[in-house]
Design a protein with these regions (language model features):
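Gly/Ser-rich oxyanion-binding loop with an adjacent helix/lid
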Residues: 1-23
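C-terminal nucleotide
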Residues: 16-177
């Protein structure tokens, strides 16, 4: 557990990060601009009765410890593995809710498949995660920016709504207001 953590406000943790993570990009592929069929608030309520929620909570605790260790050690492969498993897990729970729902779109799945193929072929640490909707976040170190952004433009934008994506990167952390 991170010291001085809070469920109420953001707590800076950047001083614990391995320097490689300070250079990370988080480019967001906008697969759909449509309103989600199930809001995040409604999705959280559906978790209350999800038969797999307790298992999920236990799994998340273990993965959080692994993630913190990966972030401290600069273990990009472990970071990416956990990141992607969490994305799959979240959307799997949505499909197992009562009633079940699916926020992924065909473009989401196509992008995921392309990212797996790109990583396997190029040996570049490009990983994805998913927000609570169809959009895909691509995370990678700045060292690979040119190659990854060319891949986005040449291979992935066709799956984005109106070719929309938001190039972004790690910021300076939370600031007290």
């Amino acid at each position: 557990e991170a010291q001085d953590s809070s469920d109420l406000y953001a707590v800076g943790w950047g001083h614990h990060l391995h320097p490689i993570f300070a250079t990370f990009h988080d480019d967001i592929l906008i697969i759909s601009k449509e309103e989600k069929g199930v809001s995040s608030t409604a999705g959280h309520k559906l978790m209350d009765d999800n038969p797999y929620s307790e298992t999920r909570y236990m799994t998340v605790q273990g993965r959080m410890k692994q993630m913190l260790a990966a972030l401290k050690a600069g273990d990009i492969e472990l970071f990416g593995d956990i990141l992607e498993k969490e994305a799959y897990s979240l959307h799997g729970l949505m499909m197992l809710s009562n009633p079940p729902y699916l926020l992924l779109r065909p473009g989401t799945v196509s992008v995921i498949e392309k990212v797996h193929e790109f990583r396997r072929t190029n040996k570049i640490p490009l990983y994805f995660t998913l927000d609570a909707g169809p959009n895909v976040h691509l995370l990678y170190p700045d060292l690979h920016k040119e190659v990854v952004q060319a891949f986005i433009k040449n291979e992935l934008l066709r799956y984005c709504s109106e070719g929309s994506y938001i190039p972004d990167k790690v910021g300076n952390g939370p600031k007290q207001l």
